Amino acid sequence: MAKSIIQEDKSHCFLCGMNENLEPIAEHHVFFGAGRRKLSEKYGLKVYLHNNKCHIFGKNSVHQNAGVDRAVKAAVQKIAMRKYGWTVEQFISIFGKNYL
C-alpha cells in the first residue's frame, strides 16, 4: 500500500480536523470506480476521515454530499499535479476527468 501524499497523520480527519477520539478514522481513496481506486492507491491519493460522520453517513460526508466530494477531489488533484508535475491534460489522461 502506498502512503498518502495528502496526509501523514492518520489520526486526524481530513475534513473536520478532529482526532480519532471522536470516532474511528477510515482510509478514503479519493478517486474510485472504473479502476480509479487502484490508481488512487498507486499515487497515494487518499485521505483519512471519520468513518461515519465524514466518510460514509454524515450529511456532509464525501459519500453523501456531492459538493464535499467534489471539493476534496479538487484539493487532491491540485496536490497531485504539483507533486507529480502533471498538467491538467495529464491528470485527465490518468483519472479520466478534471475536478478543478
Where are these regions (language model features)?
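Intrinsically disordered, low-complexity segments enriched in small/polar residues
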Residues: 31-33, 56, 65, 83, ...
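Post-HEXXH active-site segment of zinc metalloproteases
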Residues: 41, 70-76
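Short Cys/His-centered divalent metal-binding micro-motifs
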Residues: 46-72
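Short, flexible, mixed-charge glycine/proline-rich loop motifs
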Residues: 1-9, 39-44
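Short flanking/linker segments adjacent to small metal-binding domains or redox-active Cys/His motifs
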Residues: 74-100
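Hydrophobic transmembrane alpha-helix bundles
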Residues: 2, 63-67, 99-100
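Histidine-centered nuclease catalytic patch
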Residues: 14-46, 60-64
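General structural signal for secondary-structure boundaries
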Residues: 21, 42, 51, 86-87
